[in-house]
A protein has these predicted regions:
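ATP/NTP-dependent adenylation/nucleotidyl-transfer catalytic domains that generate, transfer
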Residues: 2-39, 46, 289, 293, ...
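Short helix-capping/linker segments at secondary-structure and domain boundaries
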Residues: 87-99, 243-251, 350-360, 405-411
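Hydrophobic/small residue at the entry helix of a nucleotide-binding pocket
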Residues: 167
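RNA-binding accessory domains that recognize and position tRNA/RNA substrates
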Residues: 1-157, 174-215, 224, 247
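Short amphipathic alpha-helical face segments that pack within enzyme cores
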Residues: 170, 234, 238, 340-347
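Core alpha-helical transmembrane segments of integral membrane proteins
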Residues: 157-162, 170-172
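ATP-dependent adenylate-handling ligase core
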Residues: 61, 187-321, 331
């Protein structure tokens, strides 16, 4: 991720645009049965944003729509607006956010400030902006009160968001053995739809179509501030809304323990902050305090590492030809084979899938590409930063590389490089089977899920 010195631009924009306003939210059931959600944000007189989201019609929503409880969605939609606004606020980084709808108390304001600050850690870093959480923004609510919690009588069934990569495949396959579930997709693409087809679930899923206001894209083109925002936090709030609409209380994410590691060594800057245990714990407290005691948002894979997930995924060959984790190639539904996400995925799966099959999945053997050497060094912790992508820990990458070397008679160029480092000597001695049986204690799984996962990983062998 290129670092740009935009500190002066940051300061200038904050002076020119001192107040960002969250003016209103609106939702209604359209004639076609979709729930249409919209927000109104503005900055001064010149910049107005009106993003729109479509919750696609589904028969599971019928009971809620006929219950007369539509007004109970207000606090959920308001909260979605609080996370949606971040994509627009970051263009000007206005020092004040004025909230003219909904209600927030002091604890809620603290939650949002922490989420904004940590969720934008990468954004601030890559724009060379050094600022404290107190200096970043002041949130001024119109109503400084607590929201009212709601009861819906939700079923003990589960929504599983599907991203098209290996992690959500593992969650889907493991959870479907134990309880009824339904997949959720935001902005479906070929990989997500093909994943559901391979699972035999393509005829029944929940769908959200989210649109970015084109005004934001115009500002980006004009040189306003731009960068990473915490997508997984946005997904978290949308999944709550879908839980209420569908009458399901559980939302099972696929965020693993590896997401807790900082992206920049020696700091708390984490590309995956909104996938971390810290965010998950904060979010659950927010939901219980302000929205509903019934909803259970958690990550089913939290006790596991990327290495363990890769091993589990290797047991589902029906997904090999359809899963895609490459952001650069997502629109074309390809592995670009030239980015950190592609190389990481190739590395983490290689101990468990034969080289010939890996070449078939990716279209080439990425270990043979010398132009990926610097990315390899980033993934191995040989640089100050890991890639700003959803990748595993340095330890996991090094263990996977050391194990993969044992599978080759003639080493490709990237494995040759790693074999000559001190890292190889260190990680070649690691017991892979012991790594595969580790169970991270910080999680929110119930006892049945704990036993299910422990039983599964105890049976894992290379």
């Amino acid at each position: 991720m290129p670092i740009q010195n935009n500190l002066q631009k940051f300061n200038d924009l904050r002076k020119e645009y001192p107040v960002f306003v969250y003016d209103s939210y609106h939702y209604e059931i359209a004639d076609n049965g979709n729930l249409v959600v919209s927000f109104s944000f503005f900055v001064g007189n010149a910049i107005r944003y009106n993003p729109i989201v479509y919750i696609k019609k589904h028969s599971l929503f019928d009971d809620f729509y006929t219950s007369g409880n539509l007004e109970k969605l207000q606090d959920f939609v308001f909260s979605i607006g609080m996370i949606e606004l971040l994509s627009y606020w970051k263009s000007t980084c206005s020092p004040i956010i004025e909230v003219r709808c909904g209600s927030l108390d002091e604890e809620a304001v603290s939650f949002w400030k922490k989420l904004y600050f940590n969720g934008l850690g990468e954004f601030f870093y890559t724009n060379s902006i050094e600022i404290s959480i107190d200096e970043m923004v002041t949130i001024v609510p119109q109503l400084f009160t607590s929201a009212k919690k709601h009861f819906f009588g939700l079923k003990d069934e589960t929504i599983v968001p599907i991203g098209g990569g290996k992690d959500s495949v593992v969650t889907l396959e493991e959870l479907r053995l134990a309880k009824p579930l339904i997949p959720l997709i935001i902005n479906p693409r070929k990989a997500t739809l093909e994943t559901l087809k391979a699972a035999g679930m393509d005829g029944n899923f929940l769908e959200i179509q989210r649109e970015i206001d084109p005004v934001l894209l115009e500002l980006n083109a004009k040189g306003f501030l731009n960068g990473h925002t915490p997508f997984s936090a946005m997904l978290a709030f949308y999944s709550l809304l879908l839980g209420v609409l569908s009458g399901r209380k559980n939302i099972a994410l696929s965020n693993e323990s590896s997401a807790n590691e900082a992206t920049v060594a020696g700091t708390e800057i984490n590309h995956q902050y909104s996938k971390s245990y810290e965010f998950e714990a904060d979010f659950r407290r927010y939901v219980k305090r302000y929205l509903s005691d019934e909803l259970n948002y958690y990550s089913f894979l939290r006790p596991l590492s990327e290495l363990q997930i890769a091993r589990l995924f290797s047991q589902y060959p029906q997904y090999f030809s359809v899963f895609k984790s490459c952001n650069a190639g997502s629109k074309q539904d390809i592995w670009c084979c030239n980015c950190s996400k592609c190389l990481f995925t190739f590395i983490i799966l290689s101990p468990f899938i034969a080289p010939e099959k890996m070449r078939e999945i990716f279209g080439e053997n990425l270990f043979e590409n010398p132009s990926l050497l610097y990315i390899l060094q980033e993934l191995c912790g040989l640089t100050a930063e890991k890639p700003f992508e959803c990748v595993g820990t340095v330890d996991e990458v090094c263990v996977a590389l050391a194990q993969t070397i044992k599978k080759y008679e003639k080493l490709p160029v990237l494995l040759q490089y790693f074999a000559k480092t001190e890292l190889y000597t260190k990680y070649a001695a690691v017991d892979l089977n012991e790594q595969l049986r580790h169970f991270e204690p910080k999680h929110f799984l119930n006892e049945l899920e704990i036993n299910q996962l422990i039983d599964k990983i105890n049976k894992l062998q290379r």
